[in-house]
């Protein structure tokens, strides 16, 4: 198993296996808006993958080692991807840094100031409001929410 990745600020290119999930697509947007080249695989085109493509992120829908980039700094996968998925196997067997989505979220939060919203109801609404206020107050921010914010059309 790979050691946790550090050096998130030094990434040039990141590849996602399972990029079309709600959480993975948000992390892909995070890196993309930060100037990192992002691409990925998902088995099915969806509204989320089409939005990623429209923003300039390359997505392919066939698991095929011939289609994957070979000069990536980091590979991120979701546990929904089977361990024997051929792209995941290729990257692991060839010494690439391969990490789970949850590990990347940990690294992102460890390297920044965070405001966390907890509770039973209204977390996405409150997180969207706080993120919106900070973004428009001049402080700026990134926000990972539990659901898609209508005014931003994304979880990120």
Locations of the language-model features?
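Pocket-edge structural micro-motifs
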Residues: 18, 61, 119
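Short beta->alpha linker loops
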Residues: 43-44, 63, 147-148
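Phosphate-binding loop of NTP-binding sites
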Residues: 30-33, 53, 66-70, 79-156
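A short, basic/flexible loop-to-alpha-helix module at the beginning of a structural domain
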Residues: 1-11, 64-66, 103-107
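ATP-dependent carboxylate-amine ligase
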Residues: 1-57, 71, 75, 128
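N-terminal glycine-rich dinucleotide-binding loop that anchors FAD/FMN and/or NAD(P) in oxidoreductases
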Residues: 57-64
